[in-house]
A protein has these predicted regions:
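A conserved beta-strand element that flanks and buttresses the S-adenosyl-L-methionine
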Residues: 113
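A short, conserved alpha-helix within the catalytic core of class I
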Residues: 120-133
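Class I SAM-dependent methyltransferase SAM/SAH-binding core
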Residues: 32, 40-92
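Conserved beta-strand signature within the Rossmann-like core of class I S-adenosyl-L-methionine
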Residues: 140-150
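Short alpha-helix
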Residues: 177-194
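Core SAM-dependent methyltransferase catalytic element
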Residues: 195-215
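Class I SAM-dependent methyltransferase Rossmann-like catalytic core
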Residues: 1-28
Length: 215
């Protein structure tokens, strides 16, 4: 077995996320994963949901060989080779043919999935993710699913977990452009491109899984 890059966090959260996905998603479809990282989620979800075709991507070209090796190791017909995709680029994917032309509905995605990206990327990445999702999701029925920590209205959801406050401080120290995002701000960016927050799922370790759909 190949010695592939491994994320302990991805191992911990892959099953709770899968449990949520199986409740949220339709029986079959095609999913685009943004910021696949090690590819652990892509391989796990594709194996558990054989009726869903999974397209992993990453903005870092250095990550693609390891993801490709994981795809090859999984040997699943519904798990595609990874593509280079930077959400800030005007074209998705960043190299090769564009995914979908505006008039080709059959080339759109039924789901776009993005885990643990928004807090380790500059804030404009959020707007770019929302705009790209609006372009590439199947009109009317497609959903954008994001996962990670968010700051919420404490009057509605209670005090912020100390672990999230400490994590945010650590992120800011590593890069001032990083940090846990306010959920209200993320929802506002979605609204600008015609997407609305449909579902909010509380997840382990003070994370949230959010589902956005066309408004």
């Amino acid at each position: 077995m190949l010695n592939l890059p491994h994320s302990p966090a991805a191992d911990r959260n892959k099953q709770p996320i899968l449990d949520a996905l199986t409740r949220i998603l339709d029986e079959r479809g095609t999913a685009l994963e943004i910021a696949s990282g090690t590819g652990q989620h892509a391989a796990w979800f594709a194996a558990a949901m054989p009726s869903w075709t999974w397209q992993p991507t990453d903005a870092d070209a250095r990550s693609l060989p390891a993801i490709a090796s994981r795809v090859e190791q999984a040997a699943l017909p519904n798990l595609r080779p990874p593509l280079l995709l930077d959400v800030m680029a005007p074209q998705w994917p960043s190299q090769g043919p564009a995914f979908a032309q505006e008039d080709k509905e059959e080339e759109k995605f039924d789901a776009i999935y993005c885990a643990n990206m928004l807090h380790i990327a500059p804030w404009p990445t959020c707007a770019a993710l929302m705009a790209g999702a609006a372009r590439h999701l199947r009109a009317g029925t497609g959903v954008l699913i994001t996962y990670g920590p968010y700051f919420e209205d404490e009057a509605q959801h209670g005090p912020t977990a100390p672990s999230n406050l400490a994590f945010n401080e650590d992120l800011r120290a590593r890069d001032p452009a990083w940090g846990i995002r306010r959920l209200d701000d993320v929802v506002a960016e979605a609204r600008r491109v015609g997407l609305a927050l449909r579902e909010r799922h509380a997840m382990p370790a003070n994370n949230l899984l959010l589902v956005f759909g066309f408004s």
